[in-house]
Amino acid sequence: MAKKSTPVDSGRSKGKKASAPRGGGPAVIATNRKARHDYHILDTYECGVVLVGTEVKALREGKASLVDAYATIDAGEVWLRGLHIPEYSRGNFWNHTPRRVRKLLLHRREIDSLTGKVRDGNHTLVPLQLYFVDGRLKCELALARGKQDYDKRQDIKRRTEEREVVRELGRKIKGMKG
């Protein structure tokens, strides 16, 4: 009977890579948590992002920031501005510019629909998250309307009340068991 061979460790360092998880789902690179706090999300779109080689490598290292990012529509094309992808750590002289404007890929009918809604006013395009699907970077783009301060306070109050209800139910259920 032949012996089963065991895998040998190559000795390479196992750095943090943003590849797809074992389940085959998307590997999330960056999320814009503040967007859901500052905006009412009306609709979301999945769009592709045009990148250069060193940007892809930097994103695979899990580096990106959506903090000040937003999208604009110019001449029938959607552009992502303010996205920060730091330079690739092992890049050379030809490394990319960290805050360059990147083109987003959407269907024509989606762009036309967004153009009409954004032009009417009070709406903006905000990226919610960046993730890889089948090796391609996707951006979840949201059509959003800005919240006023009183809206934010109402949301905080509502979440606090929901937490209190859950806490009380937990206490009552725990008391019934004892």
Swiss-Prot record:
Pfam families, alphabetized: SmpB (PF01668)
Single annotated GO MF: RNA binding
Localization per Swiss-Prot or TrEMBL: Cytoplasm
PROSITE patterns in UniProt: SSRP
Function: Required for rescue of stalled ribosomes mediated by trans-translation. Binds to transfer-messenger RNA (tmRNA), required for stable association of tmRNA with ribosomes. tmRNA and SmpB together mimic tRNA shape, replacing the anticodon stem-loop with SmpB. tmRNA is encoded by the ssrA gene; the 2 termini fold to resemble tRNA(Ala) and it encodes a 'tag peptide', a short internal open reading frame. During trans-translation Ala-aminoacylated tmRNA acts like a tRNA, entering the A-site of stalled ribosomes, displacing the stalled mRNA.
Protein family according to the UniProt entry: Belongs to the SmpB family.
Name used for this protein in its record: SsrA-binding protein
Organism, scientific name: Corynebacterium urealyticum (strain ATCC 43042 / DSM 7109)
